[in-house]
Amino acid sequence: MKILCKFTKLGYLKFISHLDLVDLFQRTLFQNKVDVKFSEGFNPHPRMSIAYPLPLGIESNSEYMEIYLNSRIDLKDFLIKMNERLPAGIKIIEAMYDDDESISNKVKSVVYAFKLLNTFFDKNKNIDIAKELEKINSMDIVEIERKRKKGKRRIFVKENAKEYLKRLELKDDAIYAYIKMSENGSLKPALIFDILNNYTNINIDELDIDLERIGLYQDEDGLKEIFL
């Protein structure tokens, strides 16, 4: 059996690596004597995984983790005890038993919010941001260049970002990017900067925004949440 947990990654802990985050959760599980299931083989380890790890420096209120158990536990008690030991910024918000397929197979899209700072507005005073975003939304082809593996080498290839980028929206002084996820890949947040700078009159870089991952979704349009 397994439980699916929704948790936050905020504040200075947005700079903790994926491996360190996994180690943090494992230690906290052991401290609370949670009956976690271990893998088999010569090097057994706790059976748990975090879906689509965040890049360093990005905050989120909607991260997901699967934990396999040997026996059922009281989930309310689990939430209280885990959060008592986890550092500020990491908090398990919800937990439920889940016998469905792995969460990695459920996720079809991701939504990022590029929260615009004063430096952005200083550089884009006379720009209609919503109108510029609509330019991207109306295009069939938005060419990007990125590295792909070919044999033992990595080469630069040109791709159409619209295969992954569903839409861009301006909401509450933030640019929301709705991005499809598939077996063939997705779009990293950094590529959104290239798209905006190359295909619109918007001038933006990483110093102009605070970046947050809003959530992972079960549909390609970023509407159906994992926890319903």
Region roles according to the model:
Residues 9, 67-73, 114-120, 177-183:
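Short beta-strand-to-loop capping motifs
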Residues 38-67:
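Short, charge-patterned binding micro-sites
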Residues 6-12, 16, 20, 31:
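Extended, well-folded interaction surfaces typified by the phenylalanyl-tRNA synthetase beta subunit core
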Residues 1-4:
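Extreme N-terminal starter segment of soluble prokaryotic enzymes
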Residues 78-86, 124-139, 192-193:
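Short amphipathic alpha-helices in soluble, non-transmembrane regions
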Residues 134-228:
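Core RNA-modification/binding signature centered on pseudouridine synthases
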Residues 61-113:
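Ordered, amphipathic secondary-structure segments that act as subunit-interaction surfaces
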